[in-house]
Curated annotation (Swiss-Prot):
It holds the Pfam family Pkinase. Keywords: ATP-binding, Kinase, Nucleotide-binding, Phosphoprotein, Serine/threonine-protein kinase, Transferase. ATP binds at I316, G317, K318, G319, A320, F321, G322, E323, V324, K339. The gene is CBK1. It comes from Eremothecium gossypii (strain ATCC 10895 / CBS 109.51 / FGSC 9923 / NRRL Y-1056). The active site is at D433. This is Serine/threonine-protein kinase CBK1. GO terms for molecular function: ATP binding; identical protein binding; protein serine kinase activity; protein serine/threonine kinase activity. The lineage of its organism: Eukaryota, Fungi, Dikarya, Ascomycota, Saccharomycotina.
Length: 719
């Protein structure tokens, strides 16, 4: 017997003192792990059991049973969740005992497995077969010590109809030598089989749901069917659930993307090291340097930036949806340009796609022709873009200062604009709003593009319905004032010098007119700060809503080139609606003044750029424009290393003399910006609870807007 007396009689005969419970448990544990004589008996029993199972399978294959189920009647009531009734797996074969009738023993399901599945003293798996409920294995806990009350001996067995205390392991020697009677064992088997049969009936009586699921109506652990009906929930709950889903998806997606990028950087560096004949020490230094950069980048990504981390030096730009500030990071003292965008206005004005487009362009570009993005983040009210500060201002500032460029200066800037636009097109984007305001000058005098899809009044300036409505208002005013309508066809006639009509054959500028143009250009700058905007550089196909491609950016380039050589845009007018009218009739309104001389190549290039989309130069790629005679002699590969015509001279890193900061002081904030500033002050006074309440539904589209970049943030001049 394996009971308490058996252990004491064989193990503690020479010991004068009674062992404590812990020592008895340790001895029982060693028995379970194979250091006891009973292990050989268990192995012999299992081998005999396996042979009997093989014989039963052969008999079953030769002569099926009469009941038609292909197996013994003891398994007819097994629930379907425990396996197939008609073809049980070999793991469910009932063990047979020597000297007994060939009657199968109902065993518990395979979930009642042992805790230890391997013998520590050998590589033999001693639990490959399922034992009877009353039988032990080397992997089962033993009840041979006082510690047995704390052991989870038969919870799974009890779940399927077993008693509180199954047969003790001491019954095994009796089974081997035949001392245990058939009636005792069969009696235990019949009671266990009856219990399993009752639970099987309960399992089979579980009602089915209309969709095939089951509802849990008994103690058997079946699945419970739930019908999804989100419409019963409140709208706020549905929005919160959608927000959680988006945030979780964005979290894991960004984590996977960062892991992929990290692996790509490692693979690229290793391939570069293989192509160089460097020593192992130098290669290890390069790999170690990459590891340090990865650690630094990981720390920076975990750092949550906020507006409080930056000190505003000066406002250098304003718009309808936000502003641009010159800021200094408090902990490092580095200078950046911070672009802020109002979330509520982005949501109301349907600018969500444009917001994402700008961030994607800046994040996906490594080109020297695009403004560098270091970081992007957001709070309850604003989106923030931390970009490099270009102290040279923009091309509009240069045009206001010098009015007209020479052809050599124009050739340099137009060549760089071609390369910049080509870089954007290679990324798969269309700028659609190229104008002098969005062409920035860096500290070396070379240009970079900015404002990708987020220029002031972007949506409105591209909407033809907006201008048509303004034109109808003008006609109504003219009819009310007894003024004649504009003639339908061109030619001479009245209003030859009136810039508000389509009948202008040529604009002959006097000094007074040039002063008016300078005044117009300054008002044009103020117009850029408002919600009205200007369509001076927009291609006509954008207004038509008939589909357009990358060729629309080359129209804008032609309009800018015209302004650089002539002194004003080709379709400028005092009102945006009149500019729209001229653009839609560009074949009649595009004229070159007689008092300003330009070369034939320059005029030809402008005319071929300001043409119909299907005839426009550049529709098949930027090389068409590069090969034009106007750019003869331009070295396209090294132009960025060539000295620029104008290099800004700065007195300090925060010098903003090339930005219209004086004009911005007189430009009031837009109503939306003013309202947002008041709300921010109230939130700061009320504390964090009000800030949490401010998270409205417009936050949902901006999930994933936060961005950080490896190659920028690991450089010395980054954050």
């Amino acid at each position: 017997m394996f009971g308490q007396g058996y252990y004491q009689g064989n193990r503690d005969q020479d010991s004068p003192l009674q062992r404590p419970p812990a020592a008895q448990f340790s001895s029982a544990y060693m028995e379970q792990q194979g250091s006891h004589q009973s292990l050989q008996e268990h192995l012999a029993y299992e081998q005999l059991q396996l042979q009997q199972q093989q014989q039963q399978q052969q008999q079953h294959a030769a002569a099926p049973h009469a009941n038609g189920d292909g197996y013994g009647a003891g398994f007819t009531d097994i629930p379907t969740m425990l396996g197939s009734v008609g073809a049980p797996s070999p793991a469910f074969q009932p063990p047979m005992v020597v000297g007994m009738q060939q009657q199968p023993i109902n065993t518990p399901p395979p979930t009642a497995t042992s805790i230890y599945s391997q013998n520590n003293n050998s590589f033999t798996n001693v639990n490959d077969t399922t034992l009877a409920p009353g039988h032990s294995s080397p992997g089962h806990y033993s009840n041979s010590s006082d510690y047995s009350g704390q052991q989870p001996a038969s919870s799974a067995y009890k779940q399927f109809g077993g008693s509180e205390s199954p047969l003790q392991p001491a019954a095994l020697p009796g089974l081997l030598d035949g001392s245990l009677g058939d009636q005792t064992l069969v009696g235990n088997q019949s009671s266990q089989g009856a219990m399993l049969s009752r639970q099987s009936l309960q399992c089979s009586s579980v009602p089915q749901s209309p969709n095939g699921g089951q509802r849990q109506t008994s103690g058997v652990g079946n699945y419970m069917y739930f019908e999804r009906r989100p419409e019963l929930l409140s709208k706020s709950t549905q929005e919160k659930a959608a927000a959680v889903k988006l945030k979780v998806e964005n979290f894991y997606q960004s984590s996977v993307n960062h892991a992929i990028e990290r692996n790509q950087r490692r693979v690229e560096l290793e391939s570069q090291l293989l192509s160089h004949g460097w020593s192992e020490e130098r290669k290890n230094r390069q790999l170690s340097s990459l590891g340090k950069k990865e650690s630094q980048f990981l720390r920076l990504r975990r750092t949550r930036l906020s507006l409080e981390d930056f000190h505003t030096v000066k406002v250098i730009g304003k718009g309808a949806f936000g502003e641009v500030r010159l800021v200094q990071k408090k902990d490092t003292g580095k200078i950046y340009a911070m672009k802020t965008l109002l979330k509520s206005e982005m949501y109301k004005k349907d600018q969500l796609a444009h917001v994402k487009a700008e961030r994607d362009v800046l994040a996906g570009s490594d080109s020297p022709w695009v403004v560098s993005l270091y970081y992007s983040f957001q709070d309850a009210q604003y989106l923030y873009l931390i970009m490099e500060f270009l102290p040279g201002g923009d091309l509009m500032t240069m045009l206001i200062r010098w009015q007209i460029f020479t052809e050599d200066v124009t050739r340099f800037y137009m060549a760089e604009c071609i390369l910049a636009i080509e870089a954007i097109h290679k990324l798969g984007f269309i700028h659609r709003d190229i104008k002098p305001d969005n062409i920035l000058i860096d500290i070396r005098g070379h240009i970079k593009l900015s404002d990708f899809g987020l220029s002031t009044g972007f949506h409105k300036t591209h909407d033809s319905n907006y201008y048509k409505k303004l034109l109808q208002e003008d006609e109504q005013q003219q009819n009310g004032g007894n003024m004649g309508k504009y003639p339908a066809s061109g030619g001479g006639g009245n209003g030859g010098g009136n810039r508000n009509t389509m009948l202008v054959d040529a604009i002959h500028l006097t000094m007074t007119n040039r002063q008016q143009m300078q005044t117009w250009r300054k008002s044009r700058r103020l117009m850029a700060y408002s919600t009205v905007g200007t369509p001076d550089y927009i291609a006509p196909e954008i207004f038509l809503y008939q589909g357009y491609g990358q060729e629309c950016d080359w129209w804008s380039l032609g309009a800018i080139m015209y302004e650089c050589l002539i002194g004003w845009p080709p379709f400028c007018s005092e009102t945006p609606q009149e500019t729209y009218r001229k653009i839609m009739n560009f074949e009649q309104t595009l004229v070159f003044p007689d008092d300003i001389h330009i070369s034939y190549e320059a005029e030809d290039l402008i005319r071929r750029l300001l043409s119909h989309a299907d005839e426009r130069l550049g529709r098949h790629g930027a090389n068409e424009i590069k090969n034009h005679p106007f750019f003869r002699g331009v070295d396209w590969e090294t132009i960025r290393q060539v000295g620029a015509p104008y290099i800004p001279k700065l007195s300090s890193v925060t010098d903003t003399r090339f930005f219209p900061t004086d004009e911005l002081e007189n430009v009031p904030d837009s109503p939306a910006m003013a309202q947002a500033a008041k709300q921010r002050e109230q939130m700061l006074k009320q504390g964090g609870s009000a800030a949490n309440t401010a998270q409205a539904k417009e936050d949902l589209p901006f999930i994933g807007y936060t961005y950080s970049r490896f190659d920028y943030l690991t450089r010395k001049n980054a954050l």
